[in-house]
Regions:
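Long amphipathic alpha-helical scaffold segments
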Residues: 15-35
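Globular "head" domains of long coiled-coil molecular machines
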Residues: 28-267
Length: 267
């Protein structure tokens, strides 16, 4: 299928030679060789960064309310450890970063988060070799400018392709505002994420019902109900319950922590 797609794109590039469309087609061909780009979106405190850390298998993305969570952040596989700032209307620049037994702290070099288009974190990782993960600022933020950065990144109501190949949309419950957001992916143009590559995540599933022992089972039933709802089905491929913090803890479990759990289980 990839070979057929490449051949079709090359024919289209030749047919549209000299037009603006040819550049977009060349970009599409180049992306065939890149890892899948998956954007993670959702409201503030939905658990986006926690899920991203679980998918990477390492605690890289900050989960607090610091400046870095107000900027679109790309996490991509690299041969070395590097952070690059992409200021709006200026040349990209490498920047120092620190990591003290936790998330990466990037030096913004005195720039306001609103003046930075994106941060790219290169990190040697088998998980990131398969897909580039994109953490986006929270929607429905008190600061509308922060939410707008995510909307602009995903190319809502703009005549350009979104940089994301697929979108994971995190929600606690399916509200009208969630439907409006997912409808933005239901574009007629194939270049935009559609229900085929938009997945709804019922996040923080272990907290359902005030964290009852059967919370995960309850979350699965809720997800099943949403999957059977025609209004939801037309907006996303499926709905999956996820306990992001549990997944992150499992993916980043250290040997000493495993031994402690094994000792407790033996009591």
């Amino acid at each position: 299928l990839a070979a057929q797609t490449r051949l079709l794109l090359r024919k289209a590039i030749a047919a549209y030679a000299g037009r603006d469309a040819a550049d977009r087609l060349r970009e599409a061909e180049a992306r065939l060789d890149d890892p899948l780009r998956v954007a993670i979106a959702g409201k503030v405190k939905a658990g986006k960064s926690t899920l991203l850390n679980a998918l990477i298998g390492d605690e890289l993305a900050p989960t607090d309310a610091g400046d870095c969570t107000k900027i679109v952040a790309w996490y991509t596989n690299g041969n070395t450890y590097r952070a690059t700032l992409y200021p709006s209307g200026a040349e990209p620049r490498q920047t120092p970063f620190s990591r003290d037994q936790g998330a990466i702290e990037v030096d913004l070099q005195g720039l306001d988060p609103g003046d930075i288009d994106r941060i790219v974190i290169e990190w040697p990782s088998a998980s990131l070799a398969e897909m580039t993960l994109i953490d986006t600022p929270g929607l429905a933020s008190v600061n509308e400018e922060i939410s707008k950065r995510t909307e602009d990144f995903l190319a809502f109501e703009h005549d350009r392709d979104t940089p994301a190949d697929a979108v994971l949309y995190l929600m606690r419950h399916f509200h009208r505002s969630d439907a409006r957001f997912l409808e933005a992916f239901h574009a007629e143009e194939l270049a935009h994420p559609s229900p085929v590559n938009a997945i709804a995540i019922l996040s923080r599933a272990d907290e359902l019902g005030s964290g009852r022992p059967d919370a995960l089972e309850s979350a699965q039933r809720v997800a099943n109900r949403y999957r059977g709802d025609a209004r939801v089905r037309r907006l996303c491929q499926t709905v999956l319950p996820v306990a992001g913090l549990l997944a992150q803890s499992g993916a980043t479990l250290r040997e000493v922590e495993y031994q402690a759990l094994a000792a407790l289980a033996a009591l």
